[in-house]
Amino acid sequence: MMGTMTESMSDLKNALENLSPAQHGFSYLDLERAPVAEGDLSGWIIPAKDLYDVAGMPTTFGSKARTRMATETDPFIAAYEARGALIPGKSVSSELGLTVDAEPRDLPAVHNPIWPGRTPGGSSGGAAAMVARGLVRAAHGSDGGGSIRIPAAACGIVGFKPSATTLAVHGYLTTSVEDQAFLHQLEPVLDRPLRIGVLTTPIIADTEVQSEYLTAVAEAAEKLAAAGHEVIEVGGWPEAETTFDHFTNLFSYRLAELEHYDYIAEWLREKGLHVTAEQVRESETYARTLQARLAEHWGVDVILNPTIASDPPATGAFTSLPPAENFAAQARWVPWTSLFNIAGSCAISLPWPVPGRPQPAAVHLGSLTLDDAELLALARQLHV
């Protein structure tokens, strides 16, 4: 289970002494690095996801063959570094963030600290593992289809995807909602009761939902109802297949000119080569109106659903499959999260205790009408 939070680089060094890369989740370490500024994040140690550049550190993009030395720092990472945070290294990601595991190409895979032998989820799996293990208080991640929320769910921590006009958005993995609000510089305030829709029907894949996750959602719904919200059951999304087609268009089109491709990157690149610029424009137009149409269809402010359909699968469960089967298996495990990426909505995964075992399940709140601060305020009613 989660360890005690480290509070200094000295603590981090000591904590790492007996851990392998597969356990600690770092793809690169610079334990002599010093803060570049002082600010409200002074004292925070926040590793950067290894899909993004930090000057003076290698960026692997989740693949040994893609590794390069960075000369500049990604703007999002530079912004939290300018607030005083220290970046001790990079966290493991799947290749290009394309899959919901933490198994980079020709580099060590990361193990789930609370589920030995199983995936920590992904693509921000290294970040989730180090937060869940208590090595750091927070870690940087990014979410283009669930890549913050899925590993947070798999590792029993909190993952928040801010609202955005693009599929992918930067964010953090933490152990608390309070830390999410502080990191994003938001004041969580909710001044009205909400209408909340409980959705347990998988959206993008036909799959069975494990009972522990259904129970978690039911218990969360009861707690929200007790807090004064109107909670109703909602059915599936009739446009699910069309929505996922648009998501796949936008997700794969950016890979059409990819170099150094094989396995699932090659498979997605091939799909992207068949997506036209006109189809991309159609998908972007569809995405811009999706959140409002979801709100109208369901008639709710927020959707409450399981984050993942079951406990994490074994390490290698996805990568052992041919690419098309891998992609389909991922969709069966995470049949909800990408809906909120294409809609541009903010969304959050929260751990939920399961009696009789140490590992929690996970519930997910996806906004249809709330802004980021309001969703965090609602999440705080379920998990501090």
Predicted feature descriptions by range:
Residues 105-108, 155-159, 249-252, 321-323, ...:
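Short, hinge-like loop/turn segments at secondary-structure boundaries
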Residues 1-41, 186-334, 342, 356, ...:
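Amidase signature
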Residues 40-55, 87-90, 303-307:
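ATP-grasp fold ATP-binding core
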Residues 65-71, 114, 118, 323-335:
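A short acidic, glycine-rich active-site loop
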Residues 378-382:
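Short amphipathic alpha-helices in soluble, non-transmembrane regions
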Residues 359-369, 375-376:
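Short, well-ordered beta-strand elements
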Residues 73-74, 78-184, 346-351, 360-362:
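Short glycine/serine-rich loop segments
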Residues 42-76:
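Enzymes and membrane/adaptor proteins characterized by extended Gly/Ser/Thr/Asp/Glu-rich
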